[in-house]
């Protein structure tokens, strides 16, 4: 199990400085295995995106642990955690996170700025753009891309450093059926290639691509 969360929970104060809290994620355990695609479905506000950001090492939990290859993420200093996250986790964030001033290829290459490797990343970036069907748009700007193309670009960016873990937050939101299927197929292919892939979505179509499915409701995670 390459990523494991135990006793993980998150509370938020209802008002600044207030004593009343809202439990976004109730204590839960979950693990991700290499070569498998896991899906968490649930309506907006169910806590699934909060859970994903904790698993990604971005949002500090109220309680519990997140371990990546045995290393407790939140026992690390911020710089150490960021370095581990950039090296081992590919994140497909919710919405359009492209930098409009950069080309599609340069957007895909952004992770290499944060975490360098010996081999030149440009060749890998172009290879991924071919894989996701965007080779002809490498020098285009994100404003020239459709919603489906932007999501495919985000997946290529997440896979650039060949991370063993891929976390995708609502990767098919706002896409038509054909584009949603294309995006989910790419994530399925990443799992087939050996990555541990997690998809959180308010849509149920992703379950058809999953090895394991969960639902989330009011911060509670339930195995399907």
Question: What is each PLM-predicted segment?
Answer:
Residues 13-17, 109-122, 131-132:
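ABC-type ATPase nucleotide-binding domains, specifically the catalytic core motifs of the NBD
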Residues 19, 73-90, 192:
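ABC ATPase NBD coupling module
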């Amino acid at each position: 199990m390459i990523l494991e969360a135990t006793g993980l929970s998150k509370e938020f104060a209802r008002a600044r400085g207030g004593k009343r809290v809202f439990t976004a994620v109730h204590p839960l355990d979950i693990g991700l295995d290499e070569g498998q695609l896991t899906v968490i479905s649930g309506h907006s506000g169910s806590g699934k995106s909060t859970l994903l950001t904790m698993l990604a090492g971005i949002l500090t939990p109220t309680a519990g642990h997140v371990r990546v290859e045995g290393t407790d993420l939140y026992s690390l200093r911020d710089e150490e955690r960021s370095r581990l996250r950039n090296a081992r986790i590919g994140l497909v964030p919710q919405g359009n996170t492209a930098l409009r001033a950069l080309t599609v290829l340069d957007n895909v290459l952004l992770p290499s700025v944060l975490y360098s490797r010996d081999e030149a990343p440009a060749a890998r970036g172009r290879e991924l753009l071919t894989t996701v069907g965007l080779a002809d748009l490498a020098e285009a700007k994100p404003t020239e891309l459709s919603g489906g193309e932007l999501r495919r670009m985000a997946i290529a960016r997440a896979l650039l450093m060949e991370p063993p873990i891929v976390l995708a937050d609502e990767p098919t939101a706002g896409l038509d059926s054909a584009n949603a299927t294309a995006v989910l197929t790419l994530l399925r292919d990443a799992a087939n290639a050996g990555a541990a892939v997690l998809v959180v979505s308010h849509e149920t179509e992703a379950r058809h691509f999953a090895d394991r499915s969960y639902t989330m409701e009011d911060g509670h995670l339930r195995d399907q």
